[in-house]
Amino acid sequence: INEKIIEMNSARTLLSIKQLEIVYPSQNGHGYNTAVNGLNLDLAQGEIGCLLGSSGCGKSTVLRAICGFEPAHTGEILLRDKVVSSASVHIPPNQRRVGMVFQDFALFPHLTVLENIAFGLQDLPSDKRTASAQHWLDRVSLSDKADAYPHELSGGQQQRVALARAM
């Protein structure tokens, strides 16, 4: 029975993108530039996917849209079978339960390492937020840096903080 439960859970669609289009106003103020056009994607729980393409083709834009930082012009994005982005729906990033490690790490310079990791856990009580952040700080072997600020860390350490925050 346990194998069947695992099999059913792993086949569950975690992310579904249907005919996604994302556009930006053109720099000259006339018309729009299409960043993503007609993207379809289904990713099951436990499955690993990869976006490949040349520089500027829209990979980061798609990831930002999944996280909620970019709106869908047309099409829709579903997380766990719930529409989180479409022309008429936009669930804010903090309500999507999606983490992302940015190319530049995007750490808040005025927050300590522990505060950076806890930032996305605002819906938890303070003690649970701190405990969860400390758990992930331990997992990335930076528990001794909890009170440090991002500028006091190496690039590799900053990346591990960003990874802990995404988790």
Predicted regions and their residues:
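ABC family nucleotide-binding domain
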Residues: 10-167
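Short, Lys/Arg-enriched N-terminal segments with co-localized hydrophobic residues
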Residues: 1-7
